[in-house]
A protein has these predicted regions:
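Active-site neighborhood of glycoside hydrolase catalytic domains
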Residues: 1-7, 11-22, 38
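Alpha-helical context
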Residues: 23-24, 46
Length: 173
């Protein structure tokens, strides 16, 4: 649940984006802001689920990537799943997501943010491996986990920046 870009590629080469659940970003689910002259990432075995906005944001169809064995699903019947103007079929004809599906993963309880998929057949088709998403993130010793924590000053600075952008009604940052 973020404003946009549940996955956002900025810099990087041959990143691996695998076995994730991206759910309910407000504006766009996937985006890339920097086009580089190499394979930026592989996007496989992911579930992208949303109820508002669009599937793809800026540059998704132009960034160098390979995408396959994913599930895309939009609960809003008025929204058409497309890849920046390309239908799913056209996207596949370009060599992307040839083994992917538009299908409901049937999450356990969306309202309670329990994103455990119940559609086991779909999980097999896309090679998705179940995991306890509540344990995702930095793990290890207490000292190691503390390295990932933001200081109160950093949190306050971030909150201030967001507020300033919202007051200026800046939508693309």
């Amino acid at each position: 649940n973020c404003k946009s870009g549940g996955y956002h590629q900025h810099y990087g080469k041959e990143n691996i984006i695998k076995n994730n659940i991206f759910a309910n970003q407000i504006r766009t689910q996937l985006e890339a802001s920097r086009i580089e002259q190499h394979l930026s990432f592989n996007f496989t075995n992911n579930i992208v689920y949303y109820n508002s906005g669009s599937l793809c944001g800026i540059n998704w169809k132009n960034v160098g990537h390979k995408s396959d064995y994913n599930c895309y699903y939009c609960t809003n019947a008025s929204e058409k799943i497309d890849f920046q103007g390309l239908s799913f079929s056209e996207w596949q004809h370009k060599g992307q997501d040839t083994h992917s599906f538009i299908e409901d993963p049937i999450f356990t309880d969306i309202q309670a943010e329990n994103f455990t998929p119940k559609n086991k057949e779909l999980l097999k088709k896309i090679g998705f491996r179940m995991f306890d998403y509540s344990k995702a993130g930095v793990y290890g010793s207490k000292k190691w986990k503390q390295k990932a924590e933001l200081s109160n000053e950093m949190k306050a600075a971030f909150d201030k920046l967001v507020k300033e952008y919202e007051e200026q009604n800046i939508t693309d940052w």
